[in-house]
Amino acid sequence: MSVLRPPSADELIDESLFDEDEFLPYWAELWPSGLALARHVATLDLAGRRVLELGCGLGLPSLAAALRGADVLATDWADDAIELLRRNAERNGALVRVERVRWSEPEPLLRAAPWDLVLGADLLYEERNADQLGELLPRLGGETLLAEPGRPYAQDFLRRFAAEPVADRIYRLAC
């Protein structure tokens, strides 16, 4: 798998977006959790399964799932992330649908639920993300795999969902 990515996330900082919602372009980094989840997903038999990735960023887990035969919807709030993932899917011959979705406005995801598998990598980097994700996940159905590098408040989240380790820093949640 080969992916295009921005040379520097710092160059993508938009002060007006930050002032509006404290938005920073975390999506532009190739995070170890995303790599770990993509590697794990690449070992799964996903032929014909409906897979949703939340906060996809560069979308490596989505690409891996699509290349394993899944019907994938990758979502992020950042328009630039969505556009770059479209290009990377084409570059890798992967069929990935992409959509801009806020977790606080999840109606498009709920209309398509239940999902067979929900993916997320390093989503709990802010406490407000844990709150929104905690409300959303039980409504999506299916199995959830979450890659988490060990942030302090993520531990409470993982306990809340009776997380079971399935690989290094990858957890299956009981939603």
Q: Where is each model-derived feature located?
A:
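S-adenosylmethionine-dependent methyltransferases
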Residues: 1-175
